[in-house]
């Protein structure tokens, strides 16, 4: 068997209203990249992007170029970070356009980044900007939405099972119950099972 390389894909390289409100107009992940400073001798910072420059993910040609570049280096798919907060999606434009247009024609899966968004970048929960709220009702809404993505022919499957990553399984109130519900729903939709991975 051949090992397949899947690159994590952070869809934050374009502005959204929430980030404009929380961090200032025009904020994107490039804001943080460009202001990086060296912390020790020979620490090369900031790293200025090479091949694609300070790209904007709203542009379809950027996404096509990324897929082409990934293929050149042996990457076989993208794992898009997926942000779901009790039915509210953030940073969804890029993935929505990938689904609607069918481009790039490049395999993908999703990683649910189920952490609170906070005022700090250290993973702490001191000042929550938008928080996770878990419930069985939301689990059902979420898997219903996810199944639409699973049905895309580009979606990465392992032995027919859609591959879904979860960032913080320990934050789920009852991970086993959520997994059981999700597996039941994907089976109702014609898949043999769901291939869940913890990040």
Placement of each model-derived feature along the sequence:
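Glycan-processing catalytic domains of CAZymes
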Residues: 1-199
């Amino acid at each position: 068997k051949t090992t397949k390389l899947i690159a994590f894909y952070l869809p934050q390289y374009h502005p959204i209203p929430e980030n404009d409100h929380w961090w200032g107009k025009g904020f994107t992940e490039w804001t943080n990249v460009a202001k990086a400073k060296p912390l020790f001798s020979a620490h090369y910072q900031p790293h200025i992007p090479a091949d694609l420059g300070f790209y904007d993910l709203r542009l379809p040609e950027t996404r096509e170029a990324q897929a082409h570049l990934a293929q050149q280096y042996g990457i076989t798919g993208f794992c898009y970070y997926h942000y779901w907060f009790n039915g509210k999606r953030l940073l969804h434009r890029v993935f929505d356009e990938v689904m609607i247009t069918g481009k790039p024609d490049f395999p993908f899966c999703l990683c649910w980044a189920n952490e609170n968004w906070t005022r700090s970048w250290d993973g702490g929960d001191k000042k929550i900007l938008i928080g996770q709220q878990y419930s069985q009702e939301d689990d059902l809404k979420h898997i219903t939405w996810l199944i639409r993505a699973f049905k895309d022919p580009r979606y990465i499957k392992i032995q027919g099972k859609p591959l879904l990553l979860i960032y913080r399984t320990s934050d789920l109130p009852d991970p086993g119950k959520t997994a059981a519900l999700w597996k039941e729903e994907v089976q109702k939709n014609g898949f043999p099972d769901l291939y869940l991975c913890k990040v």
